[in-house]
């Protein structure tokens, strides 16, 4: 798919898809008992409140005219008891729903994060990370309330509406029908505003996502911004994105704000009709004052759940766009996964074979075409060639970070597509060009390669890769705290820490993808000595820009145009005076010029 940038809006789904809500219901099922209890408590609390107008009617029509103060006192006590019970039930219900809401947040966020962990590298390459973050954090928070309190309130307010209608008809049928005359008008109004609201809130979702993506990108690239004095230009872009957010928000709120005045206007008209109609009939002696007051109270109650449902409707429209984005992420295909009956990979000896392997990222262009080679256990295989030739794709296929289009990849005679990914990768050490450092201590970053490693094991791995010297000079040594992405470390130091982390995992197959590109020549020489000892007995694949670092490899493969152009040791390839010879001599001449 095409790459998505901070300037690019994500595609909006035109029709509302009820399947989103049906799918979301799976997160509610495990809490349905607690939600039913919450509904019952709320319904009881609401019913208590709706009995109050009937008590008021009895007080106005019987207790006060008859000056029956004992009855009046009893009615007042009954009112207080009803309101107290209602408050208690609603409080308990609120406590239950807070717990349910937080549990739903946890469940959705856990599933979303676990799925993100399985997505291919290309997914993260094609999207601003800020757009991914906002889905996991902000969007999940927003939809959780809709899935818990929102759904419960729909049921609750529907029950409330039913109770009110029943009580109205018990008090007076004619005046109850007057109240219901406003319902068709309200229905037409809500249908009209529905689609406009949904599109408006989807636009808000897009613009907020764009702003978040740009902000995250600029926080990471703050140093580059200052180096190139781009503060003013970036501030203008941020202002433009913020104005887009403000514009779409104002449009969405304008539609949302129409709901309340619309319902309120209908409510006022209906209540006016009750008094006009009721007073005419009352004048004829057919209706009591208590009846009119009771119906007026119920009319007020009647529109309250409708207004609440309107508010819930607004929130649903707002959050459906977020729910779509969450499920869109969950539906991203995991391109590399275990087969149904995948086996555990036995202990790896290290023979790796590609048998006429072909691979492409899409159907338009083959990255690798008919690639075949065998690296024996304990051998070191180097991949060299121009940028974009397919070197990194080969090592990603070895670790099964990608799937081949055709041709088996075999490790120790076992097709790696038939084994579990975890059992395969847990026996491999992979060191990429981009050395990522997590926030925490230096020791914790190294221990990431083997969570059970002792301090001695961590130091041993660090010494082998020449990282121990600079770590020991840090303020707290291995306990020195490093910030996100290792901002306080040089690029070379970050790579040395990553080397120690990789070697600590004690891999059977070691993959180094431009792993020494950011290390100075002097450090690289010292590191090479340690690596040579570490590579003994391990199969290794090495991609290196500086060809001097791979001279000692058992097998050097020159990759170009998706295939292996030539293979052999350094001496053999130099004797051929082919592709490798030309690349090596050109690089050697460049070194002499800069010396």
Regions found by a protein language model. Name each.
Residues 35-89, 96, 169-174, 285-289:
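Transmembrane helix-loop-helix hairpins at lipid-water interfaces of multipass membrane proteins
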Residues 33, 121-122, 138-147, 151, ...:
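An intracellular "coupling" helix at the cytosolic face of ABC transporter transmembrane type-1 domains
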Residues 19-20, 28, 93, 97-101, ...:
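Juxtamembrane loop-to-helix connectors within ABC transporter transmembrane domains
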Residues 3-14, 102, 110-140, 213-237, ...:
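Short intracellular "coupling" helices and adjacent cytoplasmic loop segments at the cytosolic face
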Residues 1-49, 64-75, 93-97, 101, ...:
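Membrane-integrated ABC transporters
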Residues 338-339, 345-595:
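ABC-type nucleotide-binding domain
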Residues 40, 48, 52, 77, ...:
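Hydrophobic alpha-helical transmembrane segments of ABC transporter permease domains
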Residues 64-75, 167-181, 251, 255-324, ...:
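Helix-loop-helix
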């Amino acid at each position: 798919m095409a790459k998505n940038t901070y300037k690019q809006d994500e595609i909006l789904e035109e029709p509302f898809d009820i399947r989103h809500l049906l799918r979301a219901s799976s997160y509610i099922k495990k809490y349905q008992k607690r939600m039913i209890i919450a509904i019952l408590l709320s319904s009881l609390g609401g019913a208590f409140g709706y009995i109050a107008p009937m008590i008021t009617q009895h007080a106005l029509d019987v207790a006060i005219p008859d000056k029956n103060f004992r009855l009046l006192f009893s009615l007042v006590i009954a009112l207080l008891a009803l309101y107290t019970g209602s408050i208690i039930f609603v409080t308990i219900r609120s406590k239950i729903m807070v717990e349910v809401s937080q549990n739903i947040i946890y469940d959705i966020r856990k599933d979303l994060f676990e799925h993100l962990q399985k997505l291919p590298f290309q997914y993260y390459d094609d999207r601003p990370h800020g757009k991914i973050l906002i889905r996991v954090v902000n969007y999940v928070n927003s939809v959780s309330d809709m899935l818990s309190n929102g759904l419960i309130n729909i049921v609750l307010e529907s029950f409330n509406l039913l109770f009110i209608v029943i009580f109205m008809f018990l008090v007076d049928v004619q005046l109850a029908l007057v109240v219901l005359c406003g319902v068709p008008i309200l229905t037409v109004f809500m249908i009209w505003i529905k689609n406009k609201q949904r599109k408006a809130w989807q636009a808000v979702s897009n613009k907020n996502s764009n702003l978040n993506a740009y902000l995250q990108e600029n926080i990471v690239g703050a140093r580059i911004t200052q180096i190139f004095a781009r503060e003013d230009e970036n501030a203008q872009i941020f202002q433009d994105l913020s104005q887009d957010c403000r514009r779409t928000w104002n449009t969405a709120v304008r539609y949302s704000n129409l709901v309340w005045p619309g319902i309120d206007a209908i409510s006022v008209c209906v209540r006016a009709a009750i008094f006009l109609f009721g007073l005419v009939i009352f004048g004829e002696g057919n209706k009591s004052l208590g009846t009119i007051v009771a119906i007026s109270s119920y009319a007020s109650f009647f529109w309250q759940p409708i207004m609440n449902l309107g508010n819930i409707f607004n929130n649903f429209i707002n959050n459906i766009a977020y729910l779509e984005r969450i499920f869109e992420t969950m539906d991203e295909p995991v391109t590399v996964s275990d087969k149904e009956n995948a086996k555990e990979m036995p202990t790896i000896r290290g023979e790796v074979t590609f048998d006429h392997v072909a691979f492409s990222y899409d159907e338009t262009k083959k990255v690798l075409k008919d690639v075949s080679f065998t690296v024996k256990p304990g051998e070191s295989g180097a991949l060299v060639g121009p940028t974009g030739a397919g070197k990194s794709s080969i090592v990603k296929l070895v670790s099964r970070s990608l799937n081949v289009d055709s041709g088996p990849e075999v490790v120790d005679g076992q097709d790696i597509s038939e084994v579990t990914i975890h059992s395969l990768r847990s026996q491999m050490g992979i060191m990429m060009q981009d050395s990522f450092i997590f926030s925490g201590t230096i020791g914790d970053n190294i221990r990431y390669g083997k969570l059970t490693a002792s301090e001695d094991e961590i130091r041993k791995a660090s010494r082998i890769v020449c990282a121990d010297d600079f770590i020991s000079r840090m303020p707290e040594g291995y306990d020195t705290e490093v910030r996100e992405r290792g901002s306080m470390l040089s690029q070379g130091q970050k790579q040395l820490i990553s080397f120690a982390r990789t070697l600590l995992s004690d891999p059977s197959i070691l993959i180094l993808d431009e792993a020494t590109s950011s290390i100075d020549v002097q450090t690289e020489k010292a590191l090479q000595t340690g690596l040579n000892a570490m590579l003994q007995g391990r199969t290794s694949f090495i991609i290196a820009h500086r060809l001097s670092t791979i001279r000692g490899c058992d097998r050097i493969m020159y990759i170009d145009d998706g295939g292996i152009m030539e293979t052999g040791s350094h001496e053999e390839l130099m004797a051929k005076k082919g592709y490798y010879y030309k690349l090596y001599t050109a690089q050697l001449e460049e070194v002499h010029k800069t010396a």
